[in-house]
């Protein structure tokens, strides 16, 4: 998790920032599933994944728009 977050915030490319940010979700979900409170950890991981992916779509859209306008 630390390596992915370090790569996320030290990259020079917006696309790589987005990719590393999304890849950092996998270890976080594993942490929730492994050490969460027993009954609520599965729905909590689903909600975490859904809300994070849904809220990062505007970021991807803006990154794609800026890549088109920069060229």
UniProtKB/Swiss-Prot annotation:
GO MF assignments: NADH dehydrogenase (ubiquinone) activity; ubiquinone binding
Lineage per the UniProt record: Eukaryota, Metazoa, Ecdysozoa, Arthropoda, Crustacea
Name of the protein: NADH-ubiquinone oxidoreductase chain 4
Family under the similarity heading: Belongs to the complex I subunit 4 family.
Annotated source species: Artemia salina (Brine shrimp)
Catalyzed reactions: a ubiquinone + NADH + 5 H(+)(in) = a ubiquinol + NAD(+) + 4 H(+)(out)
Example GO biological process: electron transport coupled proton transport
Keywords from the named record: Electron transport, Membrane, Mitochondrion, NAD, Respiratory chain, Translocase, Transmembrane, Transmembrane helix, Transport, Ubiquinone
Name of the gene encoding the protein in the UniProt record: ND4
E.C. number(s) listed in UniProt: 7.1.1.2
Gene Ontology cellular-component terms listed: mitochondrial membrane
Top-level taxon in the UniProt lineage: Eukaryota
Membrane topology: Multi-pass membrane protein
Function: Core subunit of the mitochondrial membrane respiratory chain NADH dehydrogenase (Complex I) that is believed to belong to the minimal assembly required for catalysis. Complex I functions in the transfer of electrons from NADH to the respiratory chain. The immediate electron acceptor for the enzyme is believed to be ubiquinone.
UniProt keyword annotation of NADP present: no
């Amino acid at each position: 998790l630390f390596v992915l977050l370090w790569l996320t915030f030290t990259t020079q490319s917006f696309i790589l920032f987005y990719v590393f940010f999304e890849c950092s979700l996998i270890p976080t979900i594993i942490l929730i599933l492994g050490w969460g409170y027993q009954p609520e950890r599965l729905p909590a991981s689903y909600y975490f994944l859904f809300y994070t992916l849904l809220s990062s779509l505007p970021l991807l859209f803006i990154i794609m728009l800026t890549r088109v306008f920069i060229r």
